[in-house]
Amino acid sequence: MPLQIFNTTKRTIDEALLAEAIQLVIGEEGGKVGSIEAIYCGNKMIRRINRDFLNHDYATDTITFGYNEGGEVEGEFYISLDVIESNARRFGVMFEDELLRVTIHSALHLMGYDDETPELRIAMSRREDLYLDRIRGASNH
């Protein structure tokens, strides 16, 4: 299975642009898309996943599970559109831009990037900015 995008909410999202972002990150980081599922959900689903798999009883913006074996990038990530919406307001950015950033962030996690320390967070944020600029330039967003 290649890249699949699932939107479990009633909110409309630009699935083609999100798929383009995921494929760009994976390709530019030296990977090949294997089986990747990107699931866009609400707080209820992501909180349950966070609790069941990570023992954190709260909603978060994204949770990524990488299953890379061999040459192809495989995994799944969940993004809460509810958290994206509240974070966009908090950071003073458009919903679409925050959604794109977190999608890129999740794809970077699939490629092995980590954000456990301040230094790693800064490095990851720089990669996010790079890909955001590339995608915005290509799609005129």
From Swiss-Prot:
Gene Ontology biological-process entries: rRNA processing
Alphabetized Pfam families for the sequence: YbeY
Alphabetical list of InterPro entries matching this protein: MetalPrtase_cat_dom_sf_prd (IPR023091), YbeY (IPR002036), YbeY_CS (IPR020549)
Domain of life: Bacteria
Enzyme class label: hydrolase
Ligand binding (Zn(2+)): 105, 109, 115
Segments passing through the bilayer: none
EC code: 3.1.-.-
Cofactor: Zn(2+)
Alphabetized UniProt keyword annotations: Cytoplasm, Endonuclease, Hydrolase, Metal-binding, Nuclease, Ribosome biogenesis, rRNA processing, Zinc
Annotated localization: Cytoplasm
Alphabetized GO MF terms: metalloendopeptidase activity; RNA endonuclease activity; zinc ion binding
GO CC, alphabetical: cytoplasm
Keyword Zinc-finger found: no
Cofactor comment: Binds 1 zinc ion.
The family this protein is said to belong to: Belongs to the endoribonuclease YbeY family.
PANTHER family named in the record: ENDORIBONUCLEASE YBEY, CHLOROPLASTIC (PTHR46986:SF1)
Function: Single strand-specific metallo-endoribonuclease involved in late-stage 70S ribosome quality control and in maturation of the 3' terminus of the 16S rRNA.
Protein name listed in UniProt: Endoribonuclease YbeY
Naturally occurring in which organism (per UniProt): Chlorobaculum parvum (strain DSM 263 / NCIMB 8327) (Chlorobium vibrioforme subsp. thiosulfatophilum)
Gene: ybeY
